[in-house]
C-alpha cells in the first residue's frame, strides 16, 4: 500500500482504526512496531510488535472504557515523523466522562509506521477510572 505522503498515511490510519478496519490499519504498521503509551495511561508502557500492540495493549486498555475516542485535529509533517495533536474523549466504566488533549508522534520508514509515542494528561483519564 503506497501513500502520497506520511501525513496521508497517518490520516488513513486514524480513519481505519476508528472504523475498526483491522486489515487496513495493521497493513500500515511495521511487523516490529514500537508503541509507547504514556506511563500514566491504563496499561501504559512500551509494546513491541503488531500482536502485542493490537491484541494485548489496545484490548486491555480499552476494557477500562465504555467509550474512548482519539480525535485528531492537526497533522504536522516532520520528514520521517508525523506529529498529530487532538483530543481524547470518552466515558470510563465508572460512568465518568473525560476530555483531554494529546500529541502523538509517529515515525514512518518505508511507508510503514515503525514507532508511536503518546503525550497526554493522564491524570484526567485516571480520575475518570476512580
Task: Report each predicted region and the residues it spans.
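Residue-level preference for beta-strand/loop junctions
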Residues: 5, 66, 80, 98-100
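Short, cysteine-centered beta-strand-loop-beta hairpins and adjacent loop/turn segments enriched
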Residues: 90-98
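Short beta-strand edge/turn micro-motifs at domain boundaries
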Residues: 104-127
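Short, solvent-exposed coil/turn segments at beta-strand boundaries
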Residues: 28, 32, 78-80, 106-113
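Short, low-complexity N-terminal intrinsically disordered segments enriched in polar/charged residues
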Residues: 1-31, 127-130
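Hydrophobic/aromatic beta-strand elements that line small-molecule binding cavities or substrate pockets
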Residues: 70-75, 87-89, 101-107, 117
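A solvent-exposed, acidic/Ser-Thr-rich amphipathic alpha-helical stretch
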Residues: 30-78
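Short hydrophobic/aromatic-rich beta-strand segments that constitute the beta-sheet cores
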Residues: 35, 84, 115-116
Amino acid at each position: 500500500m503506497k501513500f502520497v505522503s506520511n501525513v496521508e498515511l497517518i490520516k488513513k490510519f486514524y480513519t481505519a482504526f476508528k472504523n475498526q478496519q483491522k486489515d487496513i490499519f495493521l497493513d500500515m504498521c511495521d511487523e516490529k512496531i514500537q508503541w509507547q503509551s504514556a506511563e500514566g495511561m491504563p496499561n501504559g508502557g512500551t509494546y513491541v510488535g503488531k500482536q502485542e500492540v493490537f491484541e494485548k495493549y489496545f484490548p486491555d486498555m480499552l476494557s477500562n472504557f465504555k467509550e474512548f475516542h482519539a480525535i485528531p485535529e492537526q497533522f504536522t509533517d516532520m520528514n520521517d515523523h508525523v506529529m498529530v495533536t487532538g483530543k481524547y474523549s470518552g466515558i470510563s466504566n465508572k460512568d465518568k466522562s473525560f476530555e483531554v488533549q494529546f500529541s502523538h508522534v509517529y515515525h514512518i520508514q518505508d511507508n510503514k509506521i515503525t514507532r508511536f509515542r503518546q503525550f497526554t494528561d493522564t491524570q484526567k483519564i485516571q480520575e475518570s477510572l476512580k
